Amino acid sequence: FKQDFLLDLQSVFDNLVDITEPICQDIDGNLASMLLFDTSGIEAYVAENNPKYANRIIKQIKSYAKAHNLDDSFDPYKAAYASMPASAAANHEVKQQYVNGHFCYAYKFGIMTNGLGIVRSIDFYNKDYLDSHPDIIVEKKSKSPDEDKSLADSKALIPTLKDFKKRHPIINPEIFLGD
């Protein structure tokens, strides 16, 4: 269904955003004039998301650290993160990322809402989106999940805002908040 009607579904959503904008302005013009951006991910059902997968790697790294007398500054969790693959074996669009306080394998997306909490845009950072925005980098680049998240979020912001403005020229936010 999604493959056949993805563009139609996107068009319906975009039209609803344009139709509901005047309603949002009538409810509260100040809140409607805010635009909030965040990225998140939808965890996929892949083997890499099974806690046993990560626990096995962490256990191996802890054993290695103990056998080699590594000091207390060694972080086995960061080492496990760095040693795990950047994407799931079953689907390369399912990327390793830091979502809601933990790392997992997920489909990454950006979401924009107004100050009323009404969703104005959802952009899935899938292959097609990334091909049309080569400046967005989703692959892990460091050994720290926190650093990777901040790098990926900052790279996604500008292209997502430009696409939003192109799709919804009547919406002119006065305040922008990004996480």
What kind of feature is each model-predicted range?
Residues F1-G178:
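Polybasic low-complexity intrinsically disordered regions
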